[in-house]
Amino acid sequence: MGENFNRHLGSKLRMRRLALGLTQTKVAQAINVTFQQIQKYEKGTNGISSLRIMQLANFLKVPVIYFFEDYPAYNSP
C-alpha cells in the first residue's frame, strides 16, 4: 500500500497545485520545505507526514480528506 499511496497523495497534491496555478516553489515556501521535496512528494518518491498533509491542506484550501478521496483502500468497507 505504501508506494501506491504515496503516488496517490502526490497526484492529488499536483492536481490541486496546478488547479490553483501555483509553482512547486510557492508551495514549498508555504510549508517550509525545498521545491525538490515537493517534487518528490508529487512523484510519490517520498511519503508525506500527517503534519505536512495538514499544512498542505491549509495552504491549498482543501479539507485534509481531499488527499484521501478516490483512494481504493479508503473507499472499501
Short names for language-model regions:
Residues 51-66:
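DNA major-groove recognition helix of helix-turn-helix/homeodomain DNA-binding modules
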Residues 68-77:
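Short, charged recognition helix plus adjacent turn
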Residues 11, 15, 29, 40, ...:
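DNA-binding alpha-helical recognition surfaces that contact promoter or target DNA
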Residues 1-8:
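A detector for short, charged/polar N-terminal pre-domain segments
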Residues 3, 42-43:
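A generic secondary-structure micro-motif detector
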Residues 21-40:
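Short alpha-helical DNA-recognition segment
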Residues 11-26, 55:
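Short basic helix-loop element that most often maps to the first helix and adjoining turn
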